[in-house]
Amino acid sequence: MHSQQRPNPQMNRHPYGTPGSAPQMRRPGGFAGQPPQMHGPRMVAPPAAPLPKKKKYADKCIHPKIRELEPDAENYMALLASEQKLDSTLSRKKLDIQEALKRPSKVKKRLRIYISHTFIEEKQPEKDTDEASLPMWELRVEGRLLDEQPPAPAIPGQRPVPKRKFSSFFKSLVIELDKEMYGPDQHLVEWHRTPQTNETDGFQVKRAGDRPVKCRILLLLDNHPAKFKLHPRLAKVLGIATETRPKIIEALWQYIKTHGLQDPQERDIINCDTFLSQCFGVNRMRFMEVPNKLHQLLQQTDPLEFNHIIQRPKEGQEQVSTCYDIDVEMEDPVKQFMHTFVHSPGLANDIQTLDQKCYDIIEQINELKTRRDFYARFYTEPAEFIKSWVMSQNSDLKTMNELSGDLEAERFAESYVRPETEEGVQRYMFQKVNQKRHELEQSLGVRSN
């Protein structure tokens, strides 16, 4: 007989499977719930490390049998149900936010432009070796947002979002000076945006001179998406002068629907009225022709124009400054917070860490429940439990040693091949033959000699 082993409290599975679940596969080497036992010197190669199993919602749930033993477990299940509803709501909100981020959302801000100039007086040389400096003036074009909001909090690990600089609002800047005073080569100062442009908070222009100078400043706004100026006739028909291309097409479609210009028979044909005919030069056109014909009626928007006179300030006044307020369109600052909320990994990592703690605790609880069931069955039916345990050990031993047959019967097989056993079998068979012979003779009335 194999020696009976005491149950190891460090087991991982119940011998009969978890209550309420399907029977589990037993590992070779011991009764289910016991660590593998080595029978003989045979060594088994360690199995390859399994891939980490993806956790599911069911892995967080407490088994119903455990809830019967611990009433407070119902409170945990209620919290788990609330968490599932909250996760579902957050997932829907994130999808809504992601869709909102794809749509352009602009808000109008007030940009204040400061145009100022200063004069630098002529400097006489103090020494014979010094050079005299001519009188000069300096023109500055600067600006800032009046109602600028604080930037959205940066994603952890990234730099904070900087404030938007003045030059980022414009596509180009042209300062036109008096051509007669500065000649054809010096009367224009131009700046145009390029992909390599470094943003700045203002522009400075220096020129020699101390006489009053008239200058014209042209600023072209950098709109995203780009805006276009409509032809005067089309602008009068649609009621808009400057707008983006999608907005212009939308306004044109509304005009067509309102006035019933879509052909009732051929739905892809537009029957132009008098006003549209004057704009497009045709009486009928297809919808696919609208973008090309509309493109011919769109022009680049006009730049902002400011006239400024550079002249010496009055006595006691060092700098002359003029302010202009214009409306600019910017990305909705709420989108920055939305982007931070959707793409911030900090909260997701914290939630994942807490979820992993929950998985570990639930796994420990299930292991403790398995141990409890192990000892409870041993306490309730010790004989039946030991019998099942020995049978399980026997089955595991056969699987481990790759054996077949009944090991318990094979242990007593040697007694059947001993000489005394063979002699006993022959005596038994001889006795049985004589007994049958005697019974046959009696039935036939034959008297034996």
Swiss-Prot record:
Which domain of life does the UniProt lineage start with?
Answer: Eukaryota
Pfam families reported in the protein's UniProt record: SWIB
Compartments where located: Nucleus, Nucleoplasm; Chromosome; Nucleus envelope
Q: Which UniProt keywords apply?
A: Chromatin regulator, Chromosome, Nucleus, Transcription, Transcription regulation
A single Gene Ontology biological process assigned to it is: chromatin remodeling
Name the InterPro entries on file.
SWIB_domain, SWIB_MDM2_dom_sf, SWIB_MDM2_domain
In this chain, the stretch annotated as Disordered covers: 1-56
Which residues belong to the signal peptide in this entry? none
Return the Polar residues bias intervals: 1-11
Describe the protein's quaternary organization and the partners it interacts with: Component of the multiprotein chromatin-remodeling complexes SWI/SNF: SWI/SNF-A (BAF), SWI/SNF-B (PBAF) and related complexes. The canonical complex contains a catalytic subunit swsn-4, core subunits swsn-1 and swsn-5, and accessory subunits swsn-3, swsn-6, phf-10, dpff-1, swsn-9 and either ham-3/swsn-2.1 or swsn-2.2.
In the record, the note on similarity to other proteins reads: Belongs to the SMARCD family.
Protein's name according to its UniProt entry:
SWI/SNF chromatin-remodeling accessory subunit 2
Species source reads Caenorhabditis elegans
Q: What lineage does the source organism belong to?
A: Eukaryota, Metazoa, Ecdysozoa, Nematoda, Chromadorea
